[in-house]
């Protein structure tokens, strides 16, 4: 089976596991989530309660299997029901409002951190023992800082003490209106600087360390020595011979780390009150808004799986061995 | 020199691992004796109005919270709870990882495929949203459910690494010899395979502890824990919830965050040390050597002394190594006819 198809099958299995876990978790946990929701939000209509029972279990909704099939149908049509805290807003419209913020912020800053960290890792590995390499323990400290804590400090110093950059919310709601207009985009960019900086600073050291380690191992390979012996310029040996090969494990690591970065970014959004999916998740947790929590979990999982698929395609592009295997079979 | 002293000098190989071990040891010490030496009851709200959100002073070394609670006492108890949880999760999840990894590699065939698939699926599904979902449904949130949930989601990475290593060891001669001599499967696993994976398992344990600290602090910060207990995460939760940030009470939210970061750094340093112990190439070399006035890096070709006449400074030499000129330096015979 070609590489990409094999990976597609794997992601299909992973998505199915996530969807199924989402179905069984509320049913397996002690207590009845629907009853606690009804007790908390007495204004829900009987229709809405019925929909909740279908989603979370409890009540008389036919066999478990038929509930499961109906639930699968809803997931595939992105029908996540109505929200209970902001009744009767559909959950999908709440997601639609928040996903773009998180996607742009976390996506762009993760790619920046990856490129920057990989580049620095190449240099640190090449000049093994040089000043960049020796600065790594310091960078590890930044890596160990929880995202949200660095966010707290930045909000305090840059936002509150120095007033350099705005903190809280994704744009200035008093002077701009969302849409494709220049003041709004400018304001949104200004509000994104600090959150993006937080992600880049805390995740860069991880990329750098990994790239440096692979780079050091790669430099010891015979073909790199051969390239040097041929008298190729240092730049060519570094980037075309060593770094290109060292990049492959790095890319695989990137796929696995996306989930981690997204998790950190979710909590970070809470500190900045950034109008993304992380803040929505916090509100859902604090108000026992189970349908919203479930939908957010699924959406984040699907996004991470999609990102992994994209990384796999990049790997196919960079690694001729993967392509060659496809031709031979 | 005494034997333990020599081991101490040789074992961590690098200063990095030593610093990591000492730092983590300090936090471990704080966790053990913290509750005995803390100056106040961490939950006691001092009604004295001058002690509401007071700056650090001789009585309260790290100041007080908005309700007059002593931050230092909270920190000492919090370090204990956080480290306790992380170590427990580390032990449980690493044990599960070793069990799954070794079984999967040792059995092979269907079970290997199946267990690998399960661990890869768990790896690719983002952990924190799943943790939040699991804990969100629990009517009672406390230390024990958090430990269980974190352990359940914490084993796949270790299992993957252990499996890869076991696959390598499984085909070695000494395993074949043990099989031929009629050793049972579990005996081979326990006495021949696992002892050869100790450094890997140690690294996996350190990583799991790191993950448990990060995840438990994040979960507490979101509010998904027993908010009446004091852990590093709940201190941050209350600091954030009671506007410590907006009121400029840095002594309230900086110490717990720095504590988390320092524990994390010590574990990363320890892990790097373990890594470098297993793979000497990764150890820091001495960097560039100075030969005939020019800096020569270990990755540079062996220099021909006759060409090293032009001496360059640090930055100049570094920049020059990227330029076209360096190509000519390295390829042209001494006479330079090719120019």
Question: Which residue ranges define each predicted feature?
Answer:
Chain B
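Transmembrane alpha-helix boundary and packing residues in multipass membrane permease domains
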Residues: 27, 102, 132, 136, ...
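Gly/Trp-centered helix-boundary motif
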Residues: 1-94, 98, 102-103, 110-113, ...
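Transmembrane alpha-helices
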Residues: 80-96, 186-218
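Hydrophobic residues within alpha-helical transmembrane segments
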Residues: 22-25, 76, 88-95, 118, ...
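Glycine-rich helix-loop "coupling/hinge" segments at transmembrane-helix boundaries
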Residues: 123, 136-138, 166, 207-208, ...
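Alpha-helical membrane-protein architecture signal
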Residues: 4-8, 64, 72, 76, ...
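Generic hydrophobic transmembrane alpha-helix motif, especially the helices
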Residues: 61, 95-96, 105-172, 200-202
